[in-house]
Amino acid sequence: LVPAAVFQEKQKAELLAFTFSSPEGRCLSNELKDEPAELVFGVDEDVYEFCSRSLVNPRFVHHVGPLLSLWKKQSRARLPRQLYVVLHRRRMDVACYAQGNLLFVNSFEYEHADDILYYILYVWKQAGMDQQKDQLRLFGDVPLRSEITNTLRNYLQYIDPLEIPSEAYLMGSEVLQAPLDLIALSL
């Protein structure tokens, strides 16, 4: 995530290489419509080439971009700070908001439930969140979510499942089977 004030298109590959020791092939970026920032990311060169020649004007979107827009909108209506966590297979996305203001965003790889607990509690502490009033919103595999929620309740007062936005239900029941980032992209 690069602040819009310092982002320059010609330097995005350098920024990606600085942030990641081995960035993926093609360097791309997405302007975040709700934040004064640009999301810089890498895409496998073969995937990029295949999509570019097989699709008409493909649009490449980082999976976190639509989630950030969704969470910003949700957090504006909430007084306490929100820590949003989406659990994927071996990766988790984490973002912290205070009344619509993005405080933190990152993705972490994990192998065990303990890794998830560590990252959540570490980000919670670093963001200066209050254990008694701020909220953790979790989305992902239900058994894994239940397992970590039981432990997190020893440390945090408000832990809720992250619900699929109500607008998604208007698109039909099949949409509910899609990953959250695809649902957020369609809203």
Regions found by a protein language model. Give the residues of each.
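Hydrophobic/aromatic-enriched cytosolic interaction surfaces used to assemble or bind macromolecules
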Residues: L1-L187
